Amino acid sequence: EAGSIIYELKVILAKPEIGQVGGNNSMLSKEITIYISPRISLDERSLKYLEDYGIIDVVSDVVRHEVGHWEFPQFSGRGCPYDWFLAEKIFNSIYKVLRSKKDGDYVANMFMDVVDNTNVAFSLNQKERKYKGLAWFYYDQGKSAGKYTPLYDWFVRVQSHLWMGEEEKELLKPFFNDSSIGEKIDKLVDELFERLELKKNDYNLEILLDKERWEEQARVFAEIAAKLLPLGTPIEALSSGERYGEKSSLEKK
C-alpha cells in the first residue's frame, strides 16, 4: 500500500525528545526512521482507547504518515508535498508570511501534515480501516506536554474536523485549551475552513489535494498560524517527528 519510492525502514529503540513514539523521513537518503521508547507507558484512558478499537500497532500508522508525504497509496499520485518542487513552493509561500525560519519550517510541516494525514485517513477508510494510531500519537504528545500549546491545539483541532471520528475527539479532549484561549482557537479553526472553503466532518480531498492551490492554501494557513505563535512556542513534535526549531526533513536544502 506504500508509495512508489522504495524506502529503507529503520526502527530505533530510543525515547524521542518528547512522547514515546516518533518518526521522520528523508527523501534524499530514502530512509524512514522510527523511534520507539524501550518502555511504553499507557495510562488508563489511552489503554481503554487502544483496547476498545483493537489497536495493537500504532507504529504502522506513523510509518504510513511518513510514506504519505510523498505518495499514499501506491501509484495514486496523492501525497503532500509529493515532490521537492511542490515542497519548495509550499515553504516559499509560508516564508513570505513568517519571516522567522523556525516559525516557517514548523508551520509548513503542519500544513503538509494536515493534507497528508487527511489523505491517509481517507485511503484507509476506503479499505474499511482506521487511522487510530495517529490519534494516539497526538494523545501521547498531549500527555507529554500536559496541555497542547495554542498553535498545536489549533493544528489538532483542524484535523479533528477533517478525518477524526467522535472517539478520537473524545480521546484528545483533555489536552485542548478552554476559556478565552480555547474560544480564540475555535474561531481560528472556523476561519481556516471558511477561507479554504472546507466543510467540517468531511475529508475535503478535492480541495486539499489540488496541488495548484497549495501555495495559496499554505499562505492562508500561515496567516492564521501567525495569530497563535505569540501565545507560546510549540513544544510538541509533529507527526513527521520535527520539533520547533529543527530543520525540516521535507526541505531539500
Indicate where each model-derived feature is located.
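Short, functionally important secondary-structure microenvironments
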Residues: 1-253
